[in-house]
Amino acid sequence: HSEADTIDKIDKDLFAKHLKFYAILLFRLCNSLIVPYDLVAVADELINHLNELKRLAENLPVNLEQLIEEAKSFKEVAIKLNACKMRVEEAYVKASDKSIVGEAARMINKALIRIVHELSHIMRTEAGRYGYDPYGYYLTGKPIPRVYIPIIKMNELDPNSTEYRLWETKLRRELNRVLDAIENSIDYGTMTLQIVGKCLV
């Protein structure tokens, strides 16, 4: 946005449509027992991004197989979390004492939000968790921007150059960040499933 983006530039009909959309979204979020996140869709997107990066890096000395396998493991946890979420929502409706089931729902909410925060900064930004990508930044539409950039740069450079080795180091660091985020997400999900499973017995 710029200083020229003043109120007179707004398409009032489109603005009203957006406001209605956001109002419905907020209403549903505020009235849901558990946040309506679909981690399976996130896992599928992550796997697709990693496969695309693997294709782009096929001539580079880097192996993305471990990341792809971890992303598939995360998808398995996400499927279990989705099933657990549905069980908790059903149990909450039927429960006469909603405190225990409500606590299980709170734990699932916390895990879902934590996992989404963990994965969002690696999947959607170049700047990372605490940085800021400018509005409309073209790289945010690329698969895992912080990994995409070093791969593209390395493909353009002479493998014997110093700059190539610097980008290779950057790539390995970014791949480690992605791996950490996926492993942390698996851990959050697995621990939550274990704890919630005990609550529902």
Predicted regions and their residues:
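Secretory-pathway/membrane protein signature
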Residues: H1-V201
